[in-house]
């Protein structure tokens, strides 16, 4: 999980964990045929979890961190259908992978930071059945993933979801001819461009322009017509 499995009992404190172990990812995996300038296709086939999730919030963390002066931790039992919250609520399981991607171009990027390589995107659409495409910056792609959640809301408001160790089964396919600038996701209902930036406004601009480039280049549609269609059926999240 994102804490490196360091929170296992109610006595474990986030004040005492090794923060260098935060957001670990399994990898890197060298993918034969993946070349710099191409893309890597990643299909999420299955996600399985351990039997316990750790949740947390604290001072200066997340949206409400100004209200707290210490860390708070909750441990939640997990089964194949629900996450049990505080022995009061059964939350339906919503498996997703928080950290997923390939090696970035240039200097290393820690697993807590998102970018064009993927990384800590914390996107709830990254779940079983989804297919992602990443721009490859170095030969072999060097794929990795981790930071899984058994349930998490969009925005991860308190700084952590239901952080849960487990196993992801994925299928990796090299696409050396595909050119993309940022991660792309598709599932049974949606086609999604994903962008990361210093501000939400900047990220939204990049994602929309990426979508316009992809759709127009593949369909031959006029940019003004497609932009109007975006206003009718497109969503920015």
Show which residues each predicted segment covers.
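DUTPase catalytic domain/fold
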Residues: 2-7, 36-37, 50-53, 79
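Intrinsically disordered, low-complexity linker/loop segments enriched in Gly/Pro
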Residues: 24, 46-128
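Alpha/propeptide regions of enzymes that mature by internal proteolysis
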Residues: 16-17, 24-43, 52, 127, ...
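Conserved mixed alpha/beta catalytic, RNA-binding, or beta-rich assembly cores of soluble enzyme
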Residues: 93-120, 124-201, 212
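Short acidic, glycine/serine/threonine-rich loops at helix termini
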Residues: 8-9, 52-57, 144-148
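Short, charged beta-turn/beta-strand-edge "cap" motif at the junction between a beta-strand
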Residues: 1-5, 46-50, 137-142, 236
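Short peripheral tails and domain-boundary helices/loops at the edges of structured domains
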Residues: 15-36, 59-87, 152-173
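N-terminal, Lys/Arg-enriched amphipathic/low-complexity engagement segments
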Residues: 1-17
């Amino acid at each position: 999980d994102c804490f490196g499995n360091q929170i296992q009992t109610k006595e474990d404190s986030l004040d005492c964990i090794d923060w260098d172990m935060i957001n670990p990812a399994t990898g890197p995996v060298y993918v034969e045929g993946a070349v710099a300038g191409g893309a890597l296709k990643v299909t999420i086939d299955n996600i399985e979890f351990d039997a316990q999730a750790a949740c947390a919030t604290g001072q200066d963390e997340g949206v409400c961190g100004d209200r707290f002066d210490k860390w708070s931790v909750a441990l939640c039992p997990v089964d194949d259908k629900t996450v049990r919250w505080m022995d009061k609520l059964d939350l339906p399981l919503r498996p997703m992978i928080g950290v997923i991607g390939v090696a970035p171009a240039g200097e290393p990027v820690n697993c807590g930071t998102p970018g064009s390589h993927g990384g800590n995107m914390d996107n709830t659409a990254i779940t079983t059945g989804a297919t992602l495409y990443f721009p490859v910056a170095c030969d072999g792609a060097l794929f990795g993933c981790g930071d899984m959640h058994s349930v998490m809301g969009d925005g991860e408001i308190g700084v952590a979801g239901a952080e849960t160790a487990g196993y992801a089964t994925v299928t990796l396919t090299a696409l050396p001819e595909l050119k993309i600038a940022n991660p792309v996701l598709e599932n049974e209902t949606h086609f999604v461009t994903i962008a990361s930036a210093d501000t939400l406004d900047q990220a939204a601009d990049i994602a929309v322009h990426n979508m316009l480039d992809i759709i127009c280049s593949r369909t031959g549609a006029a940019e003004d017509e497609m932009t109007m269609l975006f206003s009718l059926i497109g969503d920015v999240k």
